[in-house]
């Protein structure tokens, strides 16, 4: 056959382990860890004629990651491992309980905002091979061009929820309505996104030359002559090697 091809697409979704009761505490946004990954890979190989072959390799990946701004260490350490086992989740009047010395994991998740990251990878290679045996037996010409790119774009948003503390160890209180509350944190809506380009680079490679492979009786000759150009750019830093 003169043309051969291969195409592959895959999708992966992963979600975190946090209780959805608290990650979905706010309307219209979630503080759960979520990864959506898209992969594409394709190969195309064409025999243009008996002297010329062209191939293309193309691949790409996109990761969309959403996570709470409160880190896993804080959620696990202060929300679980070092949490006060006597501290309540709610106050008697139904509000979230929290105190500077007793972090409530429910409040930590509900007021952690959002940290979103988009990662993109692109891989591409074009290879052209010409058979010059009609001119010189065993001689071939080859050109290879590749381009790879990678970037990470981040957006962050903050929010807060209402939470209160009270002296739940006060033995003089006979009825829950007698407790006095002090507001610990105050509600604030999700802020506008704050953008940050965390990484951005590309890599360009060019390789061109000739190869010679021929046998003469008991002897063989295998030789190559080529030129290579590489350009690597990260933001404004440019490196060229030849």
Describe the function of each predicted region.
Residues 24-30, 43, 109-115, 127, ...:
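Extracellular loop and loop/strand-boundary signature of outer-membrane beta-barrel proteins
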């Amino acid at each position: 056959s003169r043309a051969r091809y291969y195409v592959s697409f895959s999708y992966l979704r992963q979600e975190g382990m946090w209780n959805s009761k608290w990650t979905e505490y706010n309307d219209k946004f979630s503080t759960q860890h979520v990864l959506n990954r898209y992969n594409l890979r394709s190969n195309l190989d064409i025999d243009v004629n008996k002297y010329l072959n062209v191939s293309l390799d193309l691949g790409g990946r996109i990761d969309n990651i959403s996570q709470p701004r409160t880190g896993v260490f804080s959620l696990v350490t202060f929300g679980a491992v070092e949490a006060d086992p006597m501290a309540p989740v709610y106050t008697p009047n139904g509000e979230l309980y929290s105190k500077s010395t007793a972090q409530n994991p429910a409040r930590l998740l509900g007021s952690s905002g959002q940290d979103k990251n988009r990662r993109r990878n692109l891989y591409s290679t074009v290879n052209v091979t010409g058979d010059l045996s009609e001119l010189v037996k065993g001689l071939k010409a080859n050109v290879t061009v590749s381009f790879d790119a990678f970037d990470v774009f981040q957006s962050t948003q903050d929010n807060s929820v209402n939470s209160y503390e009270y002296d739940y160890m006060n033995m003089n209180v006979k009825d829950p309505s007698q407790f006095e509350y002090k507001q610990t944190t105050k509600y604030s809506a999700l802020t506008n996104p704050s953008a940050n380009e965390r990484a951005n680079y590309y890599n360009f490679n060019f390789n061109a030359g000739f190869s010679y492979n021929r046998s003469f009786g008991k002897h063989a000759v295998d030789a190559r002559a080529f030129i290579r150009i590489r350009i690597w750019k990260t933001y404004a830093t440019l490196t060229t090697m030849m």
